[in-house]
């Protein structure tokens, strides 16, 4: 007896269309285009999980740089001074301090300047 794969095929296509729900135009309706769109979205998601880490680090460095230049010191000299003074605060915390607690950040700048 011949077995047709209708139920299996329908289930497989339904799975891909469910993943493409909310996509614009034919990407949410057509099976082939929907599958391609979902696979592409997974590619972007994988790439951007790595990129977001770089983007945030760039943001923190820009914030620290702006705060240190306001005090008359460059970012690189500030970070070098902190390393010489054995101050181990990561860039995320430094940027938060620069925004929320400028007095504490000014003390860190003084420590970095005095480090030899």
From Swiss-Prot:
Homology family: Belongs to the bacterial ribosomal protein bL20 family.
Name assigned to this protein: Large ribosomal subunit protein bL20
HAMAP family reported in the protein's UniProt record: Ribosomal_bL20
Function: Binds directly to 23S ribosomal RNA and is necessary for the in vitro assembly process of the 50S ribosomal subunit. It is not involved in the protein synthesizing functions of that subunit.
GO molecular function: rRNA binding; structural constituent of ribosome
InterPro entries: Ribosomal_bL20, RIBOSOMAL_L20_CS, Ribosomal_protein_bL20_C
GO cellular component: ribonucleoprotein complex; ribosome
């Amino acid at each position: 007896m011949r077995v047709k794969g209708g139920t299996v095929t329908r289930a497989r296509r339904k799975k891909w269309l469910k993943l493409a729900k909310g996509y614009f135009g034919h990407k949410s309706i057509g099976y082939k285009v929907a599958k391609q769109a979902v696979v592409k979205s997974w590619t972007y998601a994988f790439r951007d999980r790595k990129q977001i880490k770089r983007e945030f680090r760039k943001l923190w460095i820009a914030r620290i740089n702006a705060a240190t230049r306001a005090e008359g010191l460059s970012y690189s000299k500030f970070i070098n001074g902190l390393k010489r003074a054995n101050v181990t605060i990561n860039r995320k915390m430094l940027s938060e301090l620069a925004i929320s607690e400028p007095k504490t950040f000014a003390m860190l700048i003084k420590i970095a300047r005095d480090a030899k």
